[in-house]
C-alpha cells in the first residue's frame, strides 16, 4: 500500500527500517506544512505530528523519514530567539533564531507608526537587534517620513535608506553575519528587496515551494534564504497589526530605550506612570527629556495587556 501523503490529516508512521533521525532547518512555513533543509543541503517536504503548529520558519528541528522526499518534524531544538505576535484570540509565530529584525517602511503606501513601534517593542522583548529600512527613498513623498524616522535614530535604531530596484546592496553590510527577517506592511517592498539581494536563488527556492504556495507572487508565508555561509534572510508576509499580548506590563518600560533608564526611579514601586506623585516618567515627559507621545504609547500598551 502506498504511503499516506504527509500533508493529509493523518501522519504516516516512518518506516522503522529507516535510520535517519537527523536535524534540519525550516526554510518555509505553510501552516502545518513546511519545507526543511538538512545540513548537507537536502530539502524535504515536512509535516508535524498531532497537528502541532508551534514551529516557525528558522527553527532547527529533529526529523524522521517518511520516504525519499518527505519527513516528519518531531520537535524543535533550543531556540536562540522567537519572534511572534499575540492578540486576545490567537498567537502567530513569525520566525525563530533570528538575530536581527529589519522593519521595512516606505512613504507609499501610508506607513504605520503604530506598527513600527509595536514591532520595535517585540524585538526588544525577544532580544533581537532592530534596524529600520526606509525603502523607496527616492519618492518625493519620502521627505516627511524620513524626518519622523530621525526620532527613532535618537533611540539607537539605525535607519538605512534603500531603493529596492537600484541599490538594495546598501543593506548587505548590515545583514552580514546575522539571521535576518524583513517585516512590515504589505506593499513596502520586502519581497522586491529580497529578490534584489538574492537574484537567481529566489527562483530556485520558488520552484521547491510553488506547489504549496499556489504560485502567488505576493508573499503569503515566511521563507528563509541564504545570502552566504554566515548570513540568512527571511522574507515574511505583510501585516497590518502586531499584537503584544504575550508581553508583561511590568516589563514594558525596559523595552523602551527612552524610558528604561528611569526604571526604579519613581517614588512608588508600583507606579503606573499616570497620576502618581513623584513619577520619573511623567517628569521626563513634562521637561522634554522624553516624548509625551511615547509615554502615551507606553500607557496605551499597558492598558491593552491582559491582567
From Swiss-Prot:
GO terms for molecular function: GTP binding; GTPase activity; metal ion binding; rRNA binding. It is an enzyme of class 3 (hydrolase). Residues 1-21 are annotated as: Disordered. One of its GO terms (biological process) is ribosomal small subunit biogenesis. It holds the Pfam family RsgA_GTPase. GO terms for cellular component: cytoplasm. It comes from the Bacteria. Its EC number is 3.6.1.-. Its cofactor is Zn(2+). It is found in: Cytoplasm. Monomer. Associates with 30S ribosomal subunit, binds 16S rRNA. One of several proteins that assist in the late maturation steps of the functional core of the 30S ribosomal subunit. Helps release RbfA from mature subunits. May play a role in the assembly of ribosomal proteins into the subunit. Circularly permuted GTPase that catalyzes slow GTP hydrolysis, GTPase activity is stimulated by the 30S ribosomal subunit. Belongs to the TRAFAC class YlqF/YawG GTPase family. RsgA subfamily. This is Small ribosomal subunit biogenesis GTPase RsgA. It comes from Neisseria meningitidis serogroup B (strain ATCC BAA-335 / MC58). The gene is rsgA.
Amino acid at each position: 500500500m502506498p504511503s499516506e501523503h504527509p500533508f493529509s490529516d493523518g501522519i504516516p508512521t516512518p518506516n522503522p527500517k529507516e535510520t535517519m533521525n537527523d536535524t534540519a532547518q525550516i526554510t518555509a512555513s505553510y501552516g502545518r506544512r513546511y519545507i526543511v533543509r538538512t545540513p548537507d543541503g537536502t530539502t524535504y517536504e515536512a509535516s508535524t505530528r498531532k497537528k502541532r503548529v508551534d514551529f516557525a520558519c528558522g527553527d532547527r528541528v529533529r526529523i524522521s523519514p517518511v520516504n525519499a522526499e518527505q519527513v516528519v518534524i518531531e520537535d524543535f531544538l533550543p531556540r536562540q530567539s522567537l519572534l511572534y505576535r499575540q492578540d486576545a484570540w490567537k498567537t502567530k509565530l513569525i520566525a525563530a533564531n533570528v538575530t536581527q529584525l529589519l522593519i521595512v517602511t516606505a512613504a507609499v503606501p501610508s506607513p504605520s507608526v503604530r506598527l513600527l513601534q509595536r514591532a520595535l517593542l517585540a524585538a526588544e522583548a525577544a532580544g533581537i537587534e532592530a534596524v529600520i529600512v526606509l525603502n523607496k527613498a527616492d519618492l518625493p513623498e519620502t521627505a516627511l517620513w524620513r524626518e519622523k524616522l530621525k526620532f527613532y535614530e535618537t533611540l539607537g535604531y539605525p535607519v538605512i535608506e534603500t531603493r529596492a530596484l537600484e541599490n538594495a546592496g546598501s543593506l548587505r553590510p548590515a545583514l552580514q553575519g546575522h539571521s535576518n527577517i524583513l517585516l512590515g506592511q504589505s506593499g513596502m517592498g520586502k519581497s522586491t528587496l529580497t529578490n534584489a539581494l538574492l537574484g537567481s536563488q529566489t527562483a530556485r527556492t520558488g520552484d521547491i515551494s510553488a506547489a504549496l504556495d499556489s504560485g502567488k507572487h505576493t508573499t503569503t508565508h515566511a521563507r528563509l534564504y541564504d545570502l552566504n555561509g554566515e548570513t540568512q534572510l527571511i522574507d515574511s508576509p505583510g501585516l497590518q497589526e502586531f499584537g503584544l499580548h504575550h508581553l508583561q506590563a511590568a516589563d514594558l518600560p525596559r523595552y523602551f530605550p527612552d524610558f528604561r533608564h528611569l526604571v526604579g526611579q519613581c517614588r512608588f514601586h508600583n507606579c503606573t506612570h499616570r497620576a502618581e506623585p513623584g513619577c520619573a516618567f511623567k517628569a521626563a515627559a513634562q521637561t522634554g527629556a522624553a516624548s509625551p507621545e511615547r509615554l502615551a504609547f507606553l500607557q496605551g500598551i499597558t492598558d491593552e495587556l491582559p491582567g
